[in-house]
Amino acid sequence: MQKNNENILRRGRLGSSTKKEVMNYMTSLSFDKEIFESDIFCDIAHTKMLMEQNIILEEDGIKIINELKKIYNNGMDCLNLDPSLDDIHMVIESELIKNLGEDVAGRMHTGRSRNDEVATDLRMALRDKILTILKLLINMQKNILNLAKEHKETLTIGYTHLQHAQPITFGHHLLSYASPMERDILRLIDTYKRVNICPLGSGAFATTGFNINRNATKELLGFDSVIENSMDGVASRDFILETMANLSILGTNLSKICEEMVLFSSCEFGTIDLANEYTSTSSIMPQKKNPDVAEIARAKLSTLNGNLVTVLTILKALPNTYNRDLQEISPHLWDSVYTTIDTLKIIDGMISTIKVNADRMKELTEKNYSTATELADTLVRECNIPFRTAHGIVGEVVRLSIENNKNMNEVIRDVLDKFNLKLDDSKIEKALNPMENVKMRKVIGGPAPEEVERAINSYYSRIENYEKEVNDKIEKIEIIKNNLLNL
């Protein structure tokens, strides 16, 4: 039987000897709050299975489950978070033994190790967070699509190398945010499949001699399947790596949006205005309106890459199966998860509240020869010359326009005469008109308003499917949790 203040983990092999600074250094309790709920559910499911398999008495199992539900309702902060107990698993078990006695509560851990327990907890906690991130992504995607629809005919300039390139619409530009975001959604949905597999029953790494039922706990906890190799069950953390890699990719995509919010809201671009609540001012320059939120988000998203590399480095060359090194993955995982969640909310709000300067956008399309490509294309179509030849001719038109401080319309005819080419004035005017440029580009993925409208509807249709899939998963997990709490 447990004595007062006796450490149930160390008492047998190690005795009562502990050193406070070592215990504080080793404990994972500071970040185990992320798996507290999952650990309770894991304990309940495991206990229920032990009862059904007649490994423990039903009356003992019922007492354990009822006490676990009390701990769940009271929360982690009501427990004795003694660092010498290492982690939340032993804290909960110690609390159970204190309240029920070791002869009852000491049976809960039968046929199980902390190794398969924590692996199960992590997967359960992470799947919840993945679904949260997916909900935020889907909501942001819909908001971007709504804004794109509003600006499907709003002319703006497109860039390559951050130089004026060709006219497009702002709606088309916004779809360039929606497109990679859809891939982010698909990656996380696919990753969920590999997160939602159950290691419980793997034991320390070699399963157990007790007649446990792994499929029963899999069903109770809402997993799709079990991990068939017990060594891999406790050792695998690639599901964490995959999730963090996906978050790094997502963060990279989001950082581009932040960068463009900074650029486009500057005086030099002046194409958008950020809402005041997403900016700050200077302590010395009273006129300043700084895009600090976008800058902070851009910086925070960089930490996702650092966290990923840290976890990769921790995992590199670890021997099978469980090593305590794995504990140090968790802070980096949860930091990436919460940085992603917080930043998605911020960026979504920032984009949804921008004010678009359509006049400035249109003005930029009329500068710096952005319609030169269509002029070359027109020469190909109307004069039946090779594109490379047309490219050279229009390049000369641009050069002469710059040298003589003229626009292309004032130079083109002299250059065409030089090459013995004829082109109607109406064709020239159409080729040099930014909106006509845009309207002609109606192939799939193009900036023509009708194509942007089609693309938006296509995105909406797919988003509805993703949203239903995510909501179904959330509903399933909520049912699982309610069922466990009502055992």
Swiss-Prot record:
The keyword Membrane does not apply. Its main location: cytoplasm. It catalyses: 2-(N(omega)-L-arginino)succinate = fumarate + L-arginine. One of its GO terms (molecular function) is argininosuccinate lyase activity. Pathway: Amino-acid biosynthesis; L-arginine biosynthesis; L-arginine from L-ornithine and carbamoyl phosphate: step 3/3. It is found in: Cytoplasm. InterPro entries: Arg_succ_lyase_C, Argininosuccinate_lyase, Fumarase/histidase_N, Fumarate_lyase_fam, Fumarate_lyase_N, L-Aspartase-like. Keywords: Amino-acid biosynthesis, Arginine biosynthesis, Cytoplasm, Lyase. One of its GO terms (biological process) is arginine biosynthetic process via ornithine. Its EC number is 4.3.2.1. The keyword Glycosyltransferase does not apply. One of its GO terms (cellular component) is cytosol. Pfam families: ASL_C2, Lyase_1. Belongs to the lyase 1 family. Argininosuccinate lyase subfamily. This is Argininosuccinate lyase. It comes from Methanococcus aeolicus (strain ATCC BAA-1280 / DSM 17508 / OCM 812 / Nankai-3). The lineage of its organism: Archaea, Methanobacteriati, Methanobacteriota, Methanomada group, Methanococci. The gene is argH.
